[in-house]
Structures are given as C-alpha cells and as structure tokens.
Amino acid sequence: MEAGLRRSWAVTTFNRHGAGADDRVERLSGDRLHVRDLALFNGREWDVVVDTWAGAPRAARDSATALADRAGRYVYVSSCSVYAPPPLVGGDESVATVEGSPDAQAGEYASLKRGSEMAIEAAFGGRALMARAGLILGPHEDAGRLPWWLLRMDRGGEVLAPGPADLALQYVDARDLARWILDAATSDVSGVCNVASRSGHATMGALLDACRDVTGGTSSLTWVDPGYIERARIEPWSQLPIWLPPNHEFRGMHAANVERAHAAGLRCRPVEETVKDTWDWVVSIDKDPPLRPDLDPPGLDAAIESAALAAWHAARRTS
C-alpha cells in the first residue's frame, strides 16, 4: 500500500478492517471468505491487484474469478516454501512444487500457497505473476526473527552467535519486495519469479554486527561452531532465527536461484539499512513487536544460551 501511495497511485484495499486513518486510500470492507462480499467489485476496474493471501485457496479462487474481467494484472505474493522439500541449492522456478488444490479448504502453509497460485493462474493466465518470496525481513515483520535478534542484542551481555560468521544469507526486505512487485506489474513480467537477494548479499556476521551496532553495541558476540550447536540440541531457525548451518537439509532456503527477479529489476538495500529501520520500528512500538498468532515465538531461552556458552568455553579450555 505504501509503495503504491509513494507513486501517487490510486490505492484501494479490500479486507475486514474497513476504515483506516489514511484518507488517501479507498477502503472496501468485506470478507473474501464470503462470496457475496465480492459483489463490492461490481462495476469497478483496476490496473493491478496485489494479493498476499495465505489461507484457504478457495478464497483466492473466488477473488481472482471475480476480478478476472475487472483487473489488468494480478500479482500473488507466494513463497519459496511451495517447492517440494528439501529446497535445492541453486533451485530455480522450474523445481517441482508441493501438491495443491485451488478448491482446498485447509492444509499446510506450502500447499495452501500452491493452491492459491493455481487458482489465480486459472483465472488470469498470462496476466498473472507469482512472486515466490524468500525469507522476508524488515520493519513490521510479524514472524519475529529479526526483531528477536535485535532485542537479544539490546539486552546486552555475551551472545551465542551461530557460525560461521561468513555464512551466506538470502532474504528480501519487504519494502524492496513491494517496490519490485509494482515495477514488475507495470512492465508485463508474468509467470513465476523467486524474489530474494542473491545468496551472500549478507552474511550471518554482517547481520549480527549490524544488530549489535544499532542497539548500542553493549553485547559481545561469541561465535560457536555449528557442530557444537547441534550437539547441544539447539535448533536452527526456531531457536536461532534466520540461521541454518552449512550442512543443513534445508540450506537451500538461503541459496535459491533468483536471477529472473534480478533481471526484472529487483534491487536489494544493504543489510545495515534493513536492520536499522527494523530497530527504529521496534523501538517505536515500545520494543514489543507483534507476532502472528499461528507462529511459535522464535528465539533461544536465556538460561539455555548461558549454559551453552559456558560449556563451549569449557570445551575450548580443555581442547
């Protein structure tokens, strides 16, 4: 929405929230799960539809069908999670996906996203773009991954930093994703695109250094080998957000082929900017970032971290 407003586009939203504070936005209040509410689209036309739906594909099916003759282009914000696991290192848009159905009422996240893709493709054909986003970071993140690292650094003290420091990361700042979507929608990019930075745009070291610096620099990083973390039964990704060790089965999550999106104009800002702006947002909401209700809070318990660091130092002294 903000990306469209910055371009002086006429923006319309459709959701259950109704009125909002920004009078530049036309707000249609309705529930897409109720087909009767889609009658609000009657007699209207739009150049571009952007859809972030992650629920039952039938809602994407009904919305896309209702808009097929009323919108020029349809961009669906999908996910690289639709690829059949485990994700391949260097995998491009031709990699096999999970099964999905446009008529599904429920299912796992990946299959729901894939079913929604299928529904939109059926309604819009060559006028549809599936933006399969990688890991999304930046202000307003509701998965809690980057906010957890920022809040951990803000707490200070010794921080367990999962190595190696030069581990390549792949992600996309939500604002860069939004900008690319609007650019792509107006330049006739269609089909499927993996949308993220190139692998190595940032490293784990650069990310954590930036987190430490923007929060005041009172924490110290102790880099711990991946093998030790595994032996300590500390879970990557969930307990140590964003991080996956080099030999992890799902390492491809940080190594997808994203050349099609970059050829179509994707530009990714420096990790330091993403981290700073996310911290500014976290501070602005009293350091209490919201978390999606369907997700478990990420992060490592302080007692587990302290014990793991003590054991790590002891092992190094005796080796």
Predicted regions and their residues:
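N-terminal Rossmann-fold cofactor-binding loop
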Residues: 13-18, 31-32
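Conserved Rossmann-fold NAD(P)-dependent oxidoreductase catalytic core, especially the SDR/UDP-sugar
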Residues: 61-114, 122-123, 129
